[in-house]
Structure formats: structure tokens, C-alpha cells
Amino acid sequence: MQFEEFLAAPECKIMIVTYPDIFQIEAKLKYGKFSREYQDLSAIIMLDSGDLKKIGIKDGDPVAIKSEGMNVVVTAKESEEEHPGIGYMPESVWSNILGVYPVSATVSRSQQEIPAIDELLSRSVS
């Protein structure tokens, strides 16, 4: 065990807003909902560069998002525009797992892998 495992990961409170993404929709139509291409465009959150620094992560790192008892791991992407305290997620199973939008949540770095869509679907059924 590493010493870092005992330390709490820094968190950042954010408001999450969802949006439709044309590239994600195209990947779904071209490759299917269960494809890696679709997951790579869907299981993401766009964060402000300042928020990334607060939680000690960089573009492409996995993050855990927690909201009202629900949680999901997605890939953090650095936004080109400044919007501190606001995270943007494409409309998908990964964003829907967190609840009704806009939703208040905390985001922190994660060591876990991004769950596949079939894993998320089975989690929501059980």
C-alpha cells in the first residue's frame, strides 16, 4: 500500500449541465451504443482549468463524480473556455446516472476505470 492511499483526494464542488453532442451521436449511429468510440465521447466531463488544478488532475485523467448517493467515473477534459464551478457532460448513460439536471456534485480524482455502458445499465436495473 502506498501512503497516498490513506489521504483523501481533493474535491471540487460543481454544478453539472448536460448537452447534446453531434460527434457523440454520430459515433452512436456509426459504431453503436456499446462501442469504444461512443464511450470515449460520452463518458467525459468538461471542466475549467482552475477546477482541474484544485483537484490535482490533468486533461484525460479519470475522475469520480458523486451526487446524492449516485456516483460514476468518467474522463476529465479541460475546457477551452473558463467556467469555474460548472462541469459539462454530454447527454448519455454516464451523465444520466447522476440524476436530474442541472445537478450539484463533487468531483475528485479516481484510480478506477471508466465503467462500460453495459455495466452502468446493469447497475441501474438492480
Label every model-predicted segment:
Residues M1-L47, D51-S126:
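Long, contiguous, secondary-structure-rich segments that constitute the structural scaffold
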